[in-house]
């Protein structure tokens, strides 16, 4: 039996497979050893077709194992929370995502309540999927998305307060991003919108007046606008107090839509 396995294993195309997936060989050898006494495989004389069927079984088992997402402990301090976000983004930008806490067990775990360790005020732009770009799972980040990541409204600040006061997040990130359509429209001298969009652009425009008509300064306008939102949040005494007491970090950041990387601005 073992000789038959060695013969098939030595065939070039199968040897190539095992070089690529060594764990599959270990599983198949285990199957052979455990079934040798019952002479199950002797019925087929371990021909190539049977062996490839066993390989298929090995792949199924390996796939099921890979579907069990790795778990990591959640951060317990503001500094750890920020580090976890940045580490997750590094994994994302390097195509090494682990997709933690994203299975049905996590769905069931978070169904009764949420306890995110971070909050992110980001843009509504479809190119900025917050949980994905930080490689975080279900219930990890409280996400507040508005056009232009603007916090200049009671509704948005109400969401920020909820994250800080009731959910107890340890870090709040205001995330601007490259090629932001809201800021682009706000600094464009030729833009004429109506209704709600006009009101939205006026709100952003108030923060970037020095850049109106200067399309070449878009990136500077985006960075400035992001910093203004952080200043606006920090102007609330209860937020500033938590930061001063070491209970919370409030940071501005920038997401590069070309590279997938997040950079802190302060």
Each model region followed by its residue ranges:
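Bacterial N-terminal signal peptides that target proteins for export
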Residues: 45-55
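Bacterial N-terminal signal peptides
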Residues: 55-63
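Short glycine-enriched loops at secondary-structure junctions
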Residues: 122-128, 147-150, 177
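Polybasic, lysine-rich low-complexity intrinsically disordered segments
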Residues: 3, 14, 37-38, 49
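Divalent-metal-activated hydrolytic enzyme cores
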Residues: 67-115, 138-139, 149-167, 184-266
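Cationic, amphipathic, low-complexity segments that mediate targeting or membrane/lipid association
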Residues: 8-9
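Short, positively charged and aromatic/hydrophobic N-terminal segments
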Residues: 29-35, 39-42
